[in-house]
Every structure is written in C-alpha cells, then in structure tokens.
C-alpha cells in the first residue's frame, strides 16, 4: 500500500485510469508485503535526489510539495474552488510540505484511495475558533442530556438508600372556635352522659326509679350531689309520668348547670391603685401554674400594662427557666433566685423591685405542693404573711389552678388551699385532654368561688374567660 502511494506521489502526470485497472490480486499482494516494502520504499525516497534535480514537469513541481516557505501564495476566492479539480490527496493543500506529513496519515490516505472510499472532510476545515467552540459545546450539552446518570456500584456490605418520596402537602387545618375546642375537651363527660341517659329513657316513662337512676349517673359524672338533685327536680316537675327523650334531659341539664355556674363566672378584677397589684398563683404539682402565669402575662402586657414575673418555685430549675422564657416572650420583667432559696425571701425582693419600677402587676409563681404536705403548706403561709407585711392587702388575688383531669380530688385541693392561702378564684386547666369537667360544677355549687379562666391548650389564645352557658352546653352535649 505504501509503495503504491510513493509511486503516485512521483507520477502525477500519468493517466489515473491505469491505477484503477490494477488487478485486485496485486493490491492484496502489496498489502500483504506492506511492512517490508514500505521501509524499502521510504529509504529510496529519502535517498532520492533533490526535487529540483528530478526530471519532473513544471505542473508536478507546482503541485507536489506545496509552496515554498518564503513564497507568497495567492488564495483563490471560494467561488472558484468549486470549479477547480479536487487535489489528488484530500487535505494536501492544508498540510504544507509533504515531507512533514505524519506517516500514519499517509498510510490512511493511501489505503482509503485504493479501496475507492473518499476520506471524510476534516471537521475543522474552513471553521474558525468560535465555530469550533460552539460545536464542542453543543456536543457536550447533547451528551449530558442524552446520557443517563449511571449509579455507582457499591462494594459488598453497602446498599443504596431508596429515593425519598416527596412528602404529600398537608392541607392546613381549620382552626376551631373557642366553643368547638371546649366541646372537644369536654367530650368525655358529655359522651358518657348522653349515651347512658339515652339508654336509660328508651321506651320508659319518667318515674321515681328512672329519676333515681338518672341522679346516680349525674353524680358519677362529677357534677356533684347538689347539681344532680337540681337536674332531677327540674326534670320531674316538667316531664313526670310522661315519655322522656335524651334531648329533653340534655336541654334541662344544660339549663340547670348554667344556673349553677353563672354566679361564679366573673372577670378577674385588678385594683391598679395598688402598684403593684400582686397575684399569687398556687396549686398542686402538674396543674399548669407556670404556663398559666405566662398566658396571663401575655394578656396583660399586650394591653399595655407593665408586668413583673417572680420565680417563686425554687425547687425546680426547669420552672425558673420556663418562667424566664415567658418573661422574655411577653416583654415582662423577671426576677429569680438560686435553686433551693427561700421562696418567701424571693417574694419580698420581687415586691420591692416591682414597686421601685412602678410595675402595674406582679405575678408570683409558687412550688407545686400536695395538700397533705404540712411543711410545704406552712411555707405557702409564710409567703402570704411576708407579702401582708409589705402591703396589708397583699396578695390582692390568690389564684388556684385546677387540673380538669383529676376529678373529685380537685374538690379536696380547693378546700385546703382556700384555708391556707385564702384562694380567691380558680382557673381550670387541661380541658383539652381527657377532661372530667363536671367537677367544676360541683366546686362552684359548694364553694361559690369565682372561676376566672379555663384553658384548652398550650397557646396563649387557649386561655379564655369562663363562660357559664358555653360550658354547660358543652357538658350536656347540646
């Protein structure tokens, strides 16, 4: 193949048809002896005399090796290139001196010519640098789009995590009204009452036996003996000897409970002529004293009053920190002490600072204590005495928090704390759980203490003024 190429280089004037009529056997023979004949032909070409001494025609001289390095070559316009005959070797005019063309390129061109297949035109022929960059960028972009990412093969002992599924967007929950949240909190008491009452009066007329059974049901629901007797008495006077439905009982029950609760549903009065107005918050462990104080502070400071919070629960570090967070959140002043310090001494310091800073309201937290712990109840008495020495009317308000889930135990708590600390009002908390809210009716009927607020959640807006009629309807399921 190489030998045939060398012959072509030095025989440009000969008829091209002669090379095409060569037998295929000679071509195959030449290809078989390619390695041996090529080296010999190359040696002969290198040993050949200079080009200017060869007996070649002027036309061969002009086309064999290209222009000399020191001679200018006129480039014909692009339109004339199409009319001229194509050079014998494609790309020869771009390669400069034939002696500088790599041997591999010469071999490839000669082999392609022998097989009758034209070599493809070089991609960079006639393209400037910008066009070439554009082509390369398009090729890279196409390969990036078309070639899918092949995940790596992990070694033994490893596994690929599954693709995480996109979370399904959760539709925002519709915020319940206050009455809806109250009804949900009292659902336990209400559902038990309505179910049992409906079963009691199925296909029965109202008589003494059914009245006694109804009274037992009401007492078991923590409504208290007094309230149960009021309900059965009102029902007897209206429907005795007649058929009674569950709706009739619920309507009468809601009305009687409202009558019991209305006298105690009062707003919390603040005497701002006393600066500060001192509110002492008491209660057993876990009734939500600290959270209730934070909610009260949010309401008062939101109304423009200057509030100070005192961390009187010196037995729990968490209580001190929690009250500090509420103070920061509500923009209230805060005073605390070290863990285990005297709570009465803290109350004294808190009152002095509140008076010096002209605070409108001072709310003092206290440690949770069981009503049967004599020493803790004595400490509570000491706090009340110390505040009384600073101001004969202090504490001006003593609030007791009640857990709505405790049932009858709340009745005993009110009685003892009222005797020790002089409780002046109640706040019922945790009505958002499995509440047994009927006990509030029994406490109101017995102690006649004002019920200022009830809580149905952890948020500030979940502490609302007590409304007797709403509470009664929620219990009765009306």
UniProtKB/Swiss-Prot annotation:
GO MF term list: ATP hydrolysis activity; GTP binding; GTPase activity; signal recognition particle binding
Pfam families (UniProt xref): SRP54, SRP54_N
Protein's cellular compartments: Cell inner membrane; Cytoplasm
Positions of GTP binding: 283-290, 365-369, 429-432
Domain of life: Bacteria
Broad class of enzyme this protein falls into: hydrolase
GO CC annotations, alphabetized: cytoplasm; plasma membrane
Region annotation Disordered: where it falls in the sequence: 14-94
Listed SUPFAM superfamilies: Domain of the SRP/SRP receptor G-proteins, P-loop containing nucleoside triphosphate hydrolases
Topology term for the membrane: Peripheral membrane protein
UniProt keywords, alphabetically: Cell inner membrane, Cell membrane, Cytoplasm, GTP-binding, Hydrolase, Membrane, Nucleotide-binding, Receptor
Catalytic activity: GTP + H2O = GDP + phosphate + H(+)
Database matches in Gene3D superfamilies: P-loop containing nucleotide triphosphate hydrolases, Signal recognition particle SRP54, nucleotide-binding domain
Any GO BP: SRP-dependent cotranslational protein targeting to membrane
Enzyme Commission number(s) of this protein: 3.6.5.4
Biased composition (Acidic residues): 71-86
Function noted in UniProt: Involved in targeting and insertion of nascent membrane proteins into the cytoplasmic membrane. Acts as a receptor for the complex formed by the signal recognition particle (SRP) and the ribosome-nascent chain (RNC). Interaction with SRP-RNC leads to the transfer of the RNC complex to the Sec translocase for insertion into the membrane, the hydrolysis of GTP by both Ffh and FtsY, and the dissociation of the SRP-FtsY complex into the individual components.
Family: Belongs to the GTP-binding SRP family. FtsY subfamily.
Oligomeric form and interacting partners: Part of the signal recognition particle protein translocation system, which is composed of SRP and FtsY. SRP is a ribonucleoprotein composed of Ffh and a 4.5S RNA molecule.
HAMAP family: FtsY
Classification via PANTHER family: SIGNAL RECOGNITION PARTICLE RECEPTOR SUBUNIT ALPHA (PTHR43134:SF1)
Protein name according to UniProt: Signal recognition particle receptor FtsY
Organism name: Agrobacterium fabrum (strain C58 / ATCC 33970)
Gene that specifies this protein: ftsY
């Amino acid at each position: 193949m190489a030998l045939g190429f060398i012959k072509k280089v030095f025989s440009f004037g000969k008829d091209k048809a002669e090379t095409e009529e060569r037998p295929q056997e000679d071509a195959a023979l030449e290809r078989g002896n390619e390695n041996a004949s090529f080296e010999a032909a190359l040696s002969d070409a290198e040993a050949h005399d200079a080009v200017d001494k060869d007996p070649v025609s002027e036309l061969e001289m002009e086309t064999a090796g290209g222009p000399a390095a020191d001679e200018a070559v006129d480039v014909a316009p692009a339109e004339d290139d199409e009319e001229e005959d194509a050079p014998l070797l494609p790309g020869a005019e771009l390669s400069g001196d034939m002696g500088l063309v790599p041997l591999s390129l010469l071999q490839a061109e000669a082999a392609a010519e022998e097989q009758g297949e034209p070599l493809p035109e070089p991609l960079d022929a006639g393209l400037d640098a910008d066009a070439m960059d554009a082509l390369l960028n398009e090729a890279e972009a196409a390969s990036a789009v078309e070639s899918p990412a092949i995940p790596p093969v992990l070694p033994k002992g490893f596994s690929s995590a599954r693709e995480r599924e996109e979370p399904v967007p959760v539709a925002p929950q519709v915020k319940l009204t206050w009455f809806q949240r109250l009804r949900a909190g009292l659902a336990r008491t209400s559902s038990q009452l309505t179910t049992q009452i409906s079963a009691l009066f199925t296909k029965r007329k109202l008589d003494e036996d059914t009245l006694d059974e109804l009274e037992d049901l009401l007492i078991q629901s923590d409504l208290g003996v007094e309230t149960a007797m009021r309900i059965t008495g009102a029902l007897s006077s209206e429907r005795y000897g007649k058929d009674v439905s569950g709706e009739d009982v619920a309507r009468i029950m809601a009305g009687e409970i409202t009558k019991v609760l209305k006298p105690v549903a009062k707003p919390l009065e603040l005497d701002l002529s006393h600066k500060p107005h001192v509110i002492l918050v008491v209660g057993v462990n876990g009734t939500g004293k600290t959270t209730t104080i934070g909610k009260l502070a949010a309401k008062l400071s939101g109304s423009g009053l200057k509030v100070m919070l005192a961390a009187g629960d010196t037995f729990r570090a968490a209580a001190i920190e929690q009250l500090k967070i509420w103070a920061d959140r509500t923009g209230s002043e805060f005073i605390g002490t070290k863990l285990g310090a005297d709570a009465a001494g803290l109350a004294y310091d808190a009152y002095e600072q509140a008076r010096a800073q002209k605070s409108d309201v001072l709310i003092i937290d206290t440690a949770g204590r069981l009503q049967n712990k004599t020493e803790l109840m004595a400490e509570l008495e000491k706090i009340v005495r110390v505040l009384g020495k600073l101001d004969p009317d202090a504490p001006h308000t003593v609030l007791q928090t009640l857990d709505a889930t405790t049932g009858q135990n709340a009745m005993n708590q009110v009685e003892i704390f009222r005797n020790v600390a002089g409780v002046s009002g109640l706040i019922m908390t945790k009505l958002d759980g499995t509440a047994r809210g009927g006990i509030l009716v029994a406490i109101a009927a017995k102690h006649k203490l004002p019920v200022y607020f009830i809580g149905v959640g952890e948020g500030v807006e979940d502490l609302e003024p007590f409304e007797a009629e709403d509470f009664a309807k929620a219990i009765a399921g009306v």
